[in-house]
Amino acid sequence: MSFVWSAAVWVIAVAAVVISKWLYRWSNPKCNGKLPPGSMGLPIIGETCDFFEPHGLYEISPFVKKRMLKYGPLFRTNIFGSNTVVLTEPDIIFEVFRQENKSFVFSYPEAFVKPFGKENVFLKHGNIHKHVKQISLQHLGSEALKKKMIGEIDRVTYEHLRSKANQGSFDAKEAVESVIMAHLTPKIISNLKPETQATLVDNIMALGSEWFQSPLKLTTLISIYKVFIARRYALQVIKDVFTRRKASREMCGDFLDTMVEEGEKEDVIFNEESAINLIFAILVVAKESTSSVTSLAIKFLAENHKALAELKREHAAILQNRNGKGAGVSWEEYRHQMTFTNMVINETLRMANMAPIMYRKAVNDVEIKGYTIPAGWIVAVIPPAVHFNDAIYENPLEFNPWRWEGKELRSGSKTFMVFGGGVRQCVGAEFARLQISIFIHHLVTTYDFSLAQESEFIRAPLPYFPKGLPIKISQSL
C-alpha cells in the first residue's frame, strides 16, 4: 500500500512540474528580445472571453481600455487562439502599415483562417491582392459608379423611400439593405430569375454581425447556426448560376462575367470556389457596412438639429441649381456639391468604427518602441482607440461634422482609418459614400423624419442596432 501511495505522490509531483512549466511557457512565450507588457490569459482560450465584453456607441472596448491604462499603447495578449500584440497609437500603427508586405502581411488569427482555408483569395497579399482589388474596382470604382450605377442607385433609393412614406415606422437599416440589394445584385449577377434573386437576397439579408459575439452566449450559438445555414444557401445559389453561365458562354457585362473569364486564364488566380466566395463577400459587406453607417448617420442627424439644418440647406441648393425638375442626383452634384454631406459621412464613419480591429502578421521579428514582436505573431490594430483619442480629436465622443471643415474628406490617414489602413484600403469606399449621399439627399429634400423610438447601438465588438433603428417619414410640406 505504501508503494501505491508513493507512486501516486510521484505521479502527482511530476504532473505538477509539467503543468507548471506549461503554464509558465504559456504566460511567457519565447522571444528573441523584449516582449511588450501584457497577459496571455488562460491557457488555450487566452483572453478571448474578455475581448467580447459588450459596450456602447461612445466607448472604446473595455478590453482595450483597461489594458491601455495598465500596459500602455501596445500590449500582448492571446485572443482567438493566437499570440497577439495590440496597437492603439497612431505612430506605431503607421509604422506597421509602412512595413506592409515587408515585415508585416495581411492575415487573420488562425481560428478565422481554418474555416475558410489558407488558400482563400481574401487572405492573399502582394500581387494577388492587387489583382483582386483591380478587378473589383472595374465594377465598384469611381468610373463604374459614374457610368453604370449612379442612375440606378438614385432611382431605387427614391422609389423605396416613396413606398415607405406615411406608412408608420420602419427599420432604417433594413430599408437601406433592401435598396442596396435591389440595385447591386443585378450588377454583380444579372439576368437572374425573380425567384432565384429573391432566394439569394433573402439569404444575404439574413447575414448580419450579431453572430460575432461571446461564444458563451446561447443567442450567439443560435445566430451562428442561422448564419451558417443562410451562407450555405446563398453560396449554393451563386454556384449554380456560375456553373450555368460558364457552360452557356453567355456574356452579360456583370461581375460574374469577369469571374468566369478569370477562371479561364492560364495563370489562374480565381478558381471556382474563390470566385463564388468573392461574389458572396461583396454582396454581404456592401449590404451590412453601408446600411449600418447610413442608419447611424440618420440617428445622429435626428438628434442634431443644427447639422440637419445645414444638410438641408446644402441639398436645397442642389435642387435649386439642378437642370430638369425630375432629374436625379448627378455625378457632378455628388462629387462637387455635397461638401457638408461628406463631412457628416466622415464624422459618422469616425464614430461608427465599423472595423473595430484590423489584423496583420509579423513575418520576421520586428522591433518597435523598444519591444520585439516575434515572427508569426498577429498584430491587432484598434482604430477606435485612435478615433476616440482626445489628443487627436477635440471632444471625440461628440458628433461634430464641422471638425472636418477645410480638411481632405476622401482619403484616409494615420488618424482616420475608417476604410482600412496601409495598402489594403476598402475597394467599396466610393460605393459606400455614394449610396449614403444619395439616401441622405432624398431623405432630407423630400421628407420630414424622426426616430420612432430610442434605439441602442451596441458594440460586441462589431457594432449593430439590437432592435434596429425604427424611423418615421412623411412628405415635407
UniProtKB/Swiss-Prot annotation:
PROSITE patterns with a match to the protein in the record: CYTOCHROME_P450 (PS00086)
Top class in the EC scheme: oxidoreductase
Membrane-topology descriptor: Single-pass membrane protein
Transmembrane segments: 3-23
Localization annotation: Membrane
One cellular component term from this protein's GO annotations in UniProt: membrane
Other information: Constitutes with three contiguous genes an operon-like gene cluster that is involved in the thalianol pathway.
PANTHER family: CYTOCHROME P450 26, CYTOCHROME P450 708A2
Family: Belongs to the cytochrome P450 family.
Protein name: Cytochrome P450 708A2
Organism: Arabidopsis thaliana
